[in-house]
Regions:
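Amphipathic alpha-helical interface segments
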Residues: 1-99, 122-186
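Histidine-centered, metal-coordinating catalytic motifs and their short helical/loop contexts
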Residues: 93-120
Length: 186
């Protein structure tokens, strides 16, 4: 696989992460409206699947240094990338490392395997989201000479990535609002 193909695959993982995160956020907004009937399992499973796929995709990009899509195997200037990422996230190295460990732990203990842990600690994905936006911006401004050519039809700029995410948030919210009954008040 050549470098251009790797960039494209990284962009596909980013898009998948953001789509699933968008669907998850829209799901959380309507969670209280999920009916207590035979469809409930469907809705709960759908929300859980979006969480799990987002976590899996993010781990490929940020948590598994051995993965061929991990940022450390993609970016040219390794010494500059991580400090810039931490600065963008507003995190110290130790806090970021703890966050990566928590996301990886959820993936390993509950998504990839069902280990013996009794408590599922689902990670918040706000930091993961900001990391993906940073990584994408880095690729499109510093690594890829022609982002439009490499990423087409995926977002090839930060502005396009934001629109992509917002579009999927709106699409999911629209779908949920069309299908789920309104919240009943007493």
């Amino acid at each position: 696989m050549n470098r251009t193909e790797r960039f494209r695959r990284v962009a596909l993982l980013m898009a998948s992460f953001l789509r699933n995160l968008a669907y998850l956020r829209a799901f959380k907004d309507v969670h209280a409206r999920i009916p207590m009937d035979w469809t409930r399992d469907f809705w709960i499973t759908q929300g859980g699947n979006c969480t799990d796929i987002a976590v899996l995709e993010w781990c490929k990009l940020f948590a598994d240094r051995a993965d061929k899509h991990h940022w450390s195997r993609i970016v040219a200037d390794l010494d500059a990338f991580k400090p810039s990422l931490l600065a963008r996230l507003g995190m110290e190295e130790a806090a970021y490392s703890d966050y990566v460990t928590s996301v990886r732990r959820y993936r390993d203990k509950f998504v990839a395997h069902l280990d013996s842990d009794n408590v599922m600690d689902i990670p918040m994905l706000d930091i993961a989201e900001r990391a993906v936006f940073f990584y994408h911006q880095h690729l499109t401004t510093q690594e890829v000479s022609d982002p439009l050519q490499v990423f087409r039809p995926l977002p090839s700029s930060s502005a396009e990535l934001t629109l992509y995410f917002e579009h999927h948030c709106r699409a999911a919210a629209h779908t949920y609002n069309e299908v789920l009954p309104p919240l009943r008040t007493i």
